[in-house]
């Protein structure tokens, strides 16, 4: 749970990146971000967590979990600097998967900026990201509806064999990317009730 594939654009072209979320029980929960992330990407992670918190009931997440579990979001290859808003939906999906322990759809990658209200905004570098997805053997790609025109401008040979999901909000992303099925050996996300003497 909590590992999702994103698509990034770099100076040397497109690449796939993985977003990993892990949870640990804590008396003073906090959000930790690692992987050499720039300020804009850090803001995306904060936004994504706020969105998941605000829509906890829709995801069947007990809100008290946020008060008892710390969140660690990591983007591997820490030596490579990463920035930009396009990982917003990827981070949100990673968080939702971690807090629900639901599996993430296989062979699926995504790219898109999110707003606090959950809108999915278009991002750049689409052609390069598509080529990176193809190289990695990814079949399903989720992106903003407003990026649909970019796909239509790409040579058809580049997009053959790919299925695109064009979304308008983060809930659409979750509906596509998160399976109903829980992961094997799910994390025990039970709520620790305060004992009488602590109250």
What residues fall within each predicted segment?
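Peripheral, non-AAA+ core regions of ATP-driven protein-machinery
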Residues: 3-5, 12-199
